[in-house]
Amino acid sequence: MRLCDKDILTHLQEGKISITPEPDYAEISGVTVDIRLGNKFRVFTEHQAPYIDLSGPKAQVQEALNTVMSDEISVGQDKSFYLHPGELALAVTLESVTLPGNIVGWLDGRSSLARLGLMVHVTAHRIDPGWSGNIVLEFFNSGKLPLALKPGMKIGALSFEVMSDFAEKPYNARVDAKYKNQEGAIASRISGDDKTSTQ
């Protein structure tokens, strides 16, 4: 069952869902809570690597990722981050979100930004039950013009769904959780995947 605005507010007031900084009532409407852009970004740097072999040995994958990803970029609150057409960048939400083991969250971009060509998440829009931390955004500019993105701007919305029961393996309890207590624009940790798995 998807939570409506009054249920979202109740869950926040009762501490079942935590969003820090706490959203204003005006930011909760229908079935969503507005979220804002943080000030940390990562981009792909100029590189000579022809490809990244995602099925290769962990050390080799990590070395390739270190070659192509920038260090974290911090943008001042009065400055903008410019995303050019055809570019992918990682960003982070201003808000940190904590969910209990029986609620899954969903991230959606804003229609107004999509109409300018901005994708807020490339594919990863689920926030697992038991999640705690900032949410990394995978920005892609599919439009024709550079987009100036300013920290603090409204960037998307979260909705929440109550599951049939508490998860047996919530995110915060998983040993293999690569982004536990995430802060900042964390780069891909795909090198931490179990390469022996057939799933």
UniProtKB/Swiss-Prot annotation:
The active site is at residue 138. SUPFAM superfamilies: dUTPase-like. Keywords: Hydrolase, Nucleotide metabolism, Nucleotide-binding. It is an enzyme of class 3 (hydrolase). It catalyses: dCTP + H2O + H(+) = dUTP + NH4(+). GO terms for molecular function: dCTP deaminase activity; nucleotide binding. InterPro entries: dCTP_deaminase (IPR011962), dUTPase-like_sf (IPR036157), dUTPase_trimeric (IPR033704). Pfam families: DCD. DCTP binds at residues 110-115, 128, 136-138, 171, 182. One of its GO terms (biological process) is dUTP biosynthetic process. Pathway: Pyrimidine metabolism; dUMP biosynthesis; dUMP from dCTP (dUTP route): step 1/2. Its EC number is 3.5.4.13. Homotrimer. Catalyzes the deamination of dCTP to dUTP. NCBIfam families: dCTP_deam (TIGR02274). Belongs to the dCTP deaminase family. This is dCTP deaminase. It comes from Pseudoalteromonas atlantica (strain T6c / ATCC BAA-1087).
